[in-house]
Curated annotation (Swiss-Prot):
GO process terms (BP): carotenoid biosynthetic process
Role played: Catalyzes the conversion of zeta-carotene to lycopene via the intermediary of neurosporene.
InterPro entries the UniProt entry points to: Amino_oxidase (IPR002937), FAD/NAD-bd_sf (IPR036188), Zeta_caro_desat (IPR014103), Zeta_carotene_desat/Oxidored (IPR050464)
Name the UniProt record assigns to this protein: Zeta-carotene desaturase
Pathway entry: Carotenoid biosynthesis; lycopene biosynthesis
Higher taxonomy: Bacteria, Bacillati, Cyanobacteriota, Cyanophyceae, Nostocales
NCBIfam families cross-referenced by the UniProt entry: zeta_caro_desat
SUPFAM superfamilies xref list: FAD/NAD(P)-binding domain
Sorted UniProt keywords: Carotenoid biosynthesis, FAD, Flavoprotein, NAD, Oxidoreductase
Cited Pfam families: Amino_oxidase
Cofactor(s) the protein needs: NAD(+); NADP(+); FAD
UniProt keyword annotation of Flavoprotein present: yes
Any one GO molecular-function label of the UniProt entry: 9,9'-di-cis-zeta-carotene desaturase activity
Length: 479
């Protein structure tokens, strides 16, 4: 069976792997010059690895880890301390420390009761809210709890949290940075379903909240192993190939795709296959779908979905920004020093960040140079129209406010990557508009983390969606 896949993000790549394993002849068409979608990275003219976002691998990314094991990439992950660290103005740190002699849910309870990020009053109210949530039921009835959580999509997490006794202090100091890191929007604008789903995984499975990061850049340590695996099985991956049009025909009351028109520069060609998968992001699928298909609600609902803007900043320094204790270590350039983990903050326009020279040293540590901070500006709306230099200077000022001891260090290089439309906006009430991987078109399928799956718009969500798409194809087309 021949399958044509539009989009070489994780969703498209995951779809291709399962189809290739089943003996299908697969072609992937990607409009960008590199694969990976929102997890993409590339090397600039000066040899710097540039990423489109900050990519963290949670322990509950089970299907992604299975994929990585299959292609030989799981060993490229670096395990981090089981602690979620918050950096506040003035260099003060707080944490959710999940390290404990026993596992879930007790390690989570310990983390929330001992955190210095919240006041005693906030911690008590936090305990009341989480203690009256579906998460408690999930300890004995996971599927029943998930059904309840899915039904909470219509309200924001902030409204749900306050209605269960939670405080605005907890939202501001802890939950907003986490919501921004997960979905690029705050607790007032993110669905309760989205946040509680993640909490459910964390509460039930000890490993779910464990963090890992890649040894180096996504392209080198995630995508290249996938591409080698696919190429060994005959899959063809074409970059700089934009799909201009989906051709279709109707016969005997059934609509079928007959081909896709693919552009290579000024040239176009029509590709035919037995099955077609669009593994795009929100703007991509909205652009490529034939308008005539909007007569089906499954396709029309896609246009009710939205994507959020984000800006990712990378900054190189001549010392170690996150080294808070030792001035000599901070200024020396013989070895890396500082906080080797994902970091959150409630006191800057970037909600989460990391020093990649520490967390992912193979591509980002450079002898004789210091920190390479990667910071995610959320919400990204105010920054999309700003110049890269203005954004870098704005972020630098906030870095110095978080780490006053770093003011003696100089920024030596920066990069800014803006995405006007990035993650699917996980706003209240939007879940009902997310399409299934199977569509009303018999030989046309969807993948992408905006499609139906329980994980947020994430690497795991993309992987799950791709594997679901492959299963539907194999169940319905290849018989």
């Amino acid at each position: 069976m021949r399958v044509a896949i539009v989009g070489a993000g994780l969703a498209g790549l995951a779809t291709a792997i399962d189809l290739a394993d089943a003996g299908c002849e697969v072609q992937i068409f990607e409009s960008r010059p590199f694969v990976g979608g929102k997890v993409g990275s590339w090397i600039d003219g000066d040899g710097n690895h540039v990423e489109m976002g900050l990519h963290v691998f949670f322990g509950c990314y089970y299907q992604l880890f299975e994929l990585m094991n299959k292609v030989g990439a799981f060993s490229h992950l670096r395990l981090k301390e089981h602690t979620h660290t918050f950096v506040n103005k003035g260099g003060r740190t707080g944490a959710l420390d999940f390290r404990f002699f026993t596992g879930a849910p007790f390690n989570g309870l310990k983390a929330f009761f001992t955190t210095s990020q919240l006041s005693l009053q906030d911690k008590l109210q936090n305990a009341i809210a989480l203690g009256t949530s579906p998460i408690v039921r999930g300890l004995v009835d996971f599927e029943g709890a998930m059904k309840t959580i899915r039904n909470l999509d219509k309200i924001s997490f902030a409204d749900w949290f306050r209605s269960h006794g939670g405080s605005n202090g907890s939202i501001k100091r802890m939950w907003n940075p986490i919501a921004y890191a997960l979905g690029f929007i705050d607790c007032e604008n993110i669905s309760a379903r989205c946040m509680l789903t993640i909490f459910q995984f964390f509460a039930v499975r000890s490993e779910a909240s464990v963090l890992r990061m890649l040894e180096g850049s996504p392209d080198e340590y995630l995508h290249q192993p996938i591409l080698r695996y696919l190429e060994a099985r005959g899959t063809k991956v074409y970059t700089r190939r934009q799909v201009r049009e989906i051709k279709y025909a109707e016969a005997e009351g059934q609509t079928r795709v007959t081909g896709i028109v693919v552009a290579k520069g000024d040239e176009v060609e029509e590709i035919t296959a037995d099955a077609y998968v669009c593994a795009c992001d929100i703007p991509g699928i909205q652009r490529v779908l034939p308008q005539e298909w909007r007569k089906w609600s499954e396709f029309d609902n896609i246009y009710k979905l939205d994507a959020v803007p984000v800006a990712t900043v990378q900054m190189r320094f001549d010392g170690w920004v996150t080294e808070l204790q030792d001035e000599n270590k901070r200024k020396q350039l013989k070895e890396a020093a500082g906080l080797d983990n994902l970091l959150y903050t409630a006191d800057a326009d970037f909600s989460c960040f990391a020093d990649l020279a520490l967390t992912s040293p193979s591509d980002y540590y450079r002898q004789g140079q210091g920190s390479l901070l990667q910071l995610v500006l959320t919400p990204g709306d105010p920054f999309i129209k700003e110049s890269n230099e203005a954004i870098a200077q704005h972020v630098l000022k906030q870095v110095y406010e978080l780490f006053p001891s770093s003011r003696e260090l100089n920024m030596t290089w920066y990069s800014v990557v803006k995405l006007a439309q990035s993650l699917y906006r996980e706003a209240p009430g939007m879940d009902v508009y997310r399409p299934n991987q199977k569509t009303p078109i018999a030989n046309f399928f969807l993948a992408g983390s905006y499609t139906q799956q329980d994980y947020i718009d994430s690497m795991e969500g993309a992987t799950v969606s791709g594997r679901r798409a492959a299963k539907v194809i194999l169940d319905n087309i290849k018989k």
